[in-house]
Each structure stands twice: as C-alpha cells, then as structure tokens.
Amino acid sequence: MMGNNWENFLKNLGEWQGSFTQISLQGELLDSIPSILNLEGFENNELVRFRLRRFGEGGYSQPPLSDYSQEYRFLGKQVIFFDTGAFSKGSLQLAPFSEFGAESGFVAENRRLRFVQLYDPQGSLSSIILIREFRANTDARERPPLTVKQLLGQWEGIAYTVYADWQPSETCATHIEVKDIGDDRLKQELSFGDRTLTSTARIEGDILHFEDGPISRKILLLPDGASSNTPLQLKLRQSFFVEVGWLVDDNERQRLIRSYNEKGEWISSTHVIEHRVG
C-alpha cells in the first residue's frame, strides 16, 4: 500500500549539499556546480519551503550565484512520490516543436540522487544532468561509478506503478537476468507480471547500445552508481519511456521509469526496487 503523495514528498525534507553536473551525450562529465537544497516543513508540515542555492568555483565559502525559493502546499499532477521518497516528474505531453523533459529522484538514508533528461523541440536528446546530494552534517558518501560487471547476474524485486489518470496503483514482481555473451555484448531478460522481454546490447566502454527494438536506446553508466536509459530520438505517434537507475549498494538497485503512450501522453510512473539473488 503506497502512502499519499504529500507524505512521501515529506521524506525529502532536510538540507542537502551536492552538485549539478552536466553530462555529455557520451557520458563524459562536463561542468559541475556546487549546490545546497533546503526543504523545510512548516505548519505541521502542511507547508514546505524549497530553497536552492547554486555556487561558483569558490564553493560554499562564497556567496551563491543564484538563490531561488518557492513554497508548496500541494503538488502538481506531473509529479509522483513513492514510499521511499523517490519521485518522478516531467512533461505531461510530448508535443510537436516543444521541449520535453523528465526528472527522477531517489532517496536512501542520507543520500539523494536526481537526474534530468531533456530533449530539444526536434525530439533529440539534448541535455542530461546528474545531481548528487548528501544530507548536511552526515558522513554520507558517493557510490563508485557504475560498471557492466556490477549489473551482471540475477535480480528480483517489486515494481510500484502509479497511473496518470489516478486509477488504482499496481505492484508486480520483477525478475531481470543480465549475462555477458561475449564479443562486447550482453543479453538482458526482463520479466514483470506475465510478460518477458529479451534484448541484447552492444557494449562500448560505459555505454550500452540497445538496437534490436522498435526504438534504439542508449544506457549511460555513470558516477555514483547512476545510469540513464533513454531513446536516442523521440517520435510522434510512438510510445516510449525514459528511465534512471541507481545502484544504492552492491546488492540493491532502484529504477524510475516514466512512460508515455503513442499520443505522447504521460500515462504512468514506476519505481522498481531490485535485489541481487545470483
């Protein structure tokens, strides 16, 4: 049973120190901007004040380059918070000649990891941003960069899906097996509910290219145990999803999936929590 959206949002309260890092489309780290995010509850947590400060090269010892605040008493339809505090937000509709974007966020004790995926008006992936955050005054640490080897094996978990039209949320068991089949290729078999999907990827360093489906996809393996799974090109009248993963520890991986139908309408968000079983 999932808690309500606001209660799950409150699991993000606190002061989070971190950075916004621009990632190239090939997974290279570019500019990084130090940040402090405060989420503070008032009026018995019926009001939440959001404050984001971004800093220059001098870091926290210098005045912020930007300081943005906003107050929330309710959340918009486009954002879903799950029981762990993880969230999925983004565009409600893929429209012609318009930018499209999604943000995913995970919470694990004194850590948060957020990720932004942006597409230009022509539907091409244009910008990806990795946001690594640590609760202030804790010894929270960054995870190692994600590798193919860390993904290999069998994983079992539960997928929690919330629908945009507010039909009842669903849970289903998941099983995923990832094998190295040689020649710089891997095979992935994913089962959820009564469906099984099999795909193969070409390994190019820290990039996995999935090219055998209706939409070519690329998974970037990134610092802090993160991964970004995106279509290379968004097309009208073709359903799609964007996904972000986080290897919370060696034996637990979480994924956030935001799905759109062939009309370009956002239809659901899914949070998957998987544990290594082999």
Protein language model annotation of sequence segments:
Residues 5-9, 20-278:
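Soluble ligand-binding/transfer domains with enclosed cavities or grooves
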